[in-house]
Each structure stands twice: as structure tokens, then as C-alpha cells.
Amino acid sequence: MSEEKKGQQYLAALHQAFPGVVLDEGWQTKDQVTVTIKVNYLPEVVEFLYYQQGGWLSVLFGNDERQLCGNYAVYYVMSMEKGEKCWLTVRVEVDPHKPEYPSVTPRVPAAVWGEREVRDMYGLVPVGLPDERRLVLPDDWPDELYPLRKDSMDYRQRPAPTTDSETYEFINELGNKKNNVVPIGPLHVTSDEPGHFRLFVDGENIIDADYRLFYVHRGMEKLAETRMGYNEVTFLSDRVCGICGFAHSTAYTTSVENGMGIVVPERAQMIRAILLEVERLHSHLLNLGLACHFVGFDSGFMQFFRVREASMKMAEILTGARKTYGLNLIGGIRRDLLKNDMIQTRQLAQQMRRDVQELVDMLLSTPNIEQRTVGIGRLDPEIARDSAT
């Protein structure tokens, strides 16, 4: 790798704090390094990188690598922000004959969702995990059947349900049994996707809350793995989300390109950046409109959606559709941007800038918005840090 590698300072600190713990290290790109460590040191290493070296846990996932190294693997991907910015991934191998590894969650609470998911999908048990409830799999899914193992099951048939009742337990950590319970969902008029929330209340005060998601989990990862080729997955990743599909397909194509050493032309990279910005515009305007709706300011909701229409028109001009689907390919972009299309897009962007500024000024001068937002829902910085928020 000809370019200077980033992350050297973190590796030096890691070797100094934990001598002999790192088994292997290697760069995937100039700013992305992976270290394989001894599994019993996992909680201490992640805690050290997270709190002392300024890392943020972006994602963690498992992988069935028995055909590669004879073991499963778990990856903790961290965005290092304190000094030199880079991605540092901590990898451990897990023995398939004893699929256990020490949980990081007691030391870094942000790991709880990822470790629950790894247990659901791979059957790898994080020993010491405080929350052992299922995360992704439904209550009637058979025990000892782990969907993302390579030899798991025949996916042409759904396994027979093991129960006809809901067994999931919602937890009220901060309250008591005397609290009233207000259920919201799984289907609710304000929800864009199914999600079941339980609010534990004492009078008008919400004491605690718990929730359950993944009601419409589609198994896209296994679908891509078992039924699609590399290029077909690009179109599937576009449809991970109805709002931010191009971001997902860019993440997928970039990963494949980095792994295979494919150099993407500069013009294709610029077109990707433009389409990502178009997607960001319509996504942010959508959520600003919804924020107005949630506080009872429906005039703002309608105005933001009116302005958002221009971003949808941008997408149609540049891609042929009102969403940025189907443009990404491994190695580049499916079609170029024409000069006249770019001129129209610039004109729309200039008008949107003026319209959005007017709407922001209107919001900031509306007393009801101020009353329902200023000082509301403040999250303690320490809790935010623990949760990688």
C-alpha cells in the first residue's frame, strides 16, 4: 500500500497497554486497519480503545469463517476520533466447539445490541451479557437454529413455529410494578415502520421505556449470500431503505471495490457524491417535516414536504427516477450526468436554499416550536458516550 497508513498511534498504544495480546494486524485501506487479538482480552481491549483512545463503536458483527480458519469471528468496528482519524476493527476468533466469548457490554454498553444480534444469528454466546433477550429473531423461531451460519438451513422453507404466543419480556429498570404501562405499536399512525414501545408511567411522568423492533426483518444478508451474485447485490442494497438506498449501495460497492483492489474513476466518485447529497437533501427535509408533525405543527410539515419535492425532481433529472435507485455498480456508475441536467439541478438547489432558509426562520420564530423543543429530551452526555450516540 503506497499511501501512508493511518492508525499507527492506536496500534502502538494497544501494544504498550496489552503486550502479546495482538495476534495479527493488517490494513484493508490506508485508513482502515484490523487487529486480531486473544479472545479473553476482548472486553479490556475494546474498553481501552473506546474510552482512553477516543474510539466510537460504529458497528459489530459476526461471521462464519469455518471454511477459512476453522472458527467463527466477531468484529468490533470502531471510528477513532481522538487523534488521527481512522477505522480500527478488533477481531476475535470463536471456537465452534465452544461458541462463547466474553461480553463487552458490561464495560462498553454500546455493544449490547450487536452482541444480542450475533447471538441470534450465529449462536455465539457473549458470556456476561446483561440482556439475554432475543433481538432479531421472533419468539416462535426454533432454538439452536442460527440463520447466518453457512450450513444453517434450507431457506426455501420457513421452519415450523415453536410457540403461538409472545414470550418477549419488556423491562422496567427504573420503575416498579405499580407503574402503569402504555403500549404503543407495533403498528401506530406515527410510526414509519413497525415497532412496539412500552412506556412505564407514574401519573404524567414517564419513568422508563422499552421497545422491540425487527418485526419486518427481511433476511437480506442471507438472500444476498445464497441467491445473488456480486453485481446483483448492488440492486438489493439499494432497497435496504426506502429513503437512504443510495447510501447503502455505495457502502456495498465501496466495500467490494476496496476488497478487490478496484480503482473507481474520479468522475464516478464525484457522481456518487452528488447523488448522496441529493439523497441527504430529501431525507433531511422529510425528517424536518415529520418533526413538525410530531409537535403538532402541521403547517411546517406540509411546507417542508413542498420544498422536498424539488429534491425528488433532482433525483428524477439525474437518474430517471424519483429515487436514486439503480445507479451504483461495482467499479463505478451506470450512467453519466449530462450538462443540461446539471444546470437544472443547480437551479433547483439554489431555489431550495432560499426556501429552506425561509422555513427555518419561520420555525425559529414560532412560539409553539420553541416550547416543545428547547430543553426537551436532553440526553446526559455520559449516557450518550456510553451508548455511542
Where is each model-derived feature located?
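Terminal low-complexity/charged segments
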Residues: 1-205, 365, 369-372
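Catalytic cofactor-binding cores of redox enzymes
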Residues: 112, 133, 137-205, 209-389
